[in-house]
């Protein structure tokens, strides 16, 4: 799990500091980096669907405001709440299997139990609603009030999503097996990528800093766990990092607009 960071001035490894005229790059771990991303996509979809059901308790199902398209409230709320619920569930289960069960691959159990549980909950809620309502309910009755305004909003958030995605992948991306990061932020990415890989390629439970063994974590790390878990599920690191970052920022802008 060695990472090689080459800047315009120095080459950093986990054991040495070498003068180098090279470019900024990080050699990518060639495990799940080359794998499929389907399980990672399923994870995000399950999180969004679970969050949609849970967030209705906060946003109020069936409520509507004249002229306001509440879909821009529902979408980010679903993503945010769902990611929190599913990711914490997977982390706690994985922690239990690692610390108590002494499992060598705790994320396997965490993801199987967490994702299966989320799917079961979603199915049970859907069946219960279908029976209570006596059929399928029109999904957009309370979420879309102004269709003319909706077209402009879709254009706005579509352009924002394209720009933010470009910005994220411009700074952090993988090309030919090499993980590149921006000139002014590569130093910050070193501990972040190490934390991600400590989950996707390691067993960092109880969680501690990869760079400072034995010290408990005093810095928020659940984003790194989420990204590492998505990479564990087969999603390439840059996709995992940038997709979550893009969705989070676009969701924040949707809430700000709403």
Residue ranges of model-derived segments:
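Membrane-embedded, hydrophobic transmembrane alpha-helices
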Residues: 2-4, 8-16, 22-147
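Alpha-helical membrane-embedded segments
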Residues: 120, 159-160
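Alpha-helical transmembrane segments and their helix-start/interface "positive-inside/aromatic belt" motifs
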Residues: 74, 149-158
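Active-site lumenal/periplasmic loops and adjacent helix-entry segments of GT-C-fold
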Residues: 160-258
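Alpha-helical transmembrane segments of multi-pass membrane proteins
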Residues: 64-67, 157, 238-239
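Short secondary-structure boundary micro-motifs
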Residues: 41, 67, 155-156, 168, ...
């Amino acid at each position: 799990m060695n990472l090689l960071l080459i800047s315009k001035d120095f080459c950093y490894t986990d054991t040495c500091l070498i003068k180098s005229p090279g470019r900024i790059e990080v050699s990518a771990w060639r495990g799940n980096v080359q794998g499929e991303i389907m399980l990672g996509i399923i994870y995000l979809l399950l999180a969004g669907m679970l969050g949609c059901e849970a967030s209705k308790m906060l946003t109020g199902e069936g409520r509507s405001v004249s002229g306001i398209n509440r879909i821009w409230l529902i979408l980010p709320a679903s993503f945010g709440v769902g990611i929190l619920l599913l990711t914490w569930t997977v982390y706690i289960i994985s922690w239990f299997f690692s610390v108590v069960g002494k499992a060598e691959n705790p994320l396997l159990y965490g993801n199987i139990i967490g994702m299966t549980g989320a799917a079961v909950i979603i199915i049970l809620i859907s069946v219960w609603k279908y029976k209570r309502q006596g059929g399928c309910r029109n999904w957009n009755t309370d979420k879309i009030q102004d269709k003319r305004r909706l077209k402009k909003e879709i254009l706005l958030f579509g352009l924002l999503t394209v720009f933010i995605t470009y910005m994220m992948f411009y700074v952090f991306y993988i090309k030919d097996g090499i993980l590149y990061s921006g000139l002014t932020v590569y130093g910050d990415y070193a501990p972040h990528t190490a934390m991600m890989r400590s989950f996707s390629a390691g067993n960092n439970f109880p969680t501690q800093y990869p760079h400072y063994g034995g010290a408990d974590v005093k810095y928020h790390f659940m984003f790194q766990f989420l990204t590492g878990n998505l990479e564990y599920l087969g999603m390439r690191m840059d996709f995992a990092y940038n997709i979550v970052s893009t969705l989070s920022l676009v969701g924040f802008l949707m809430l700000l607009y709403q």
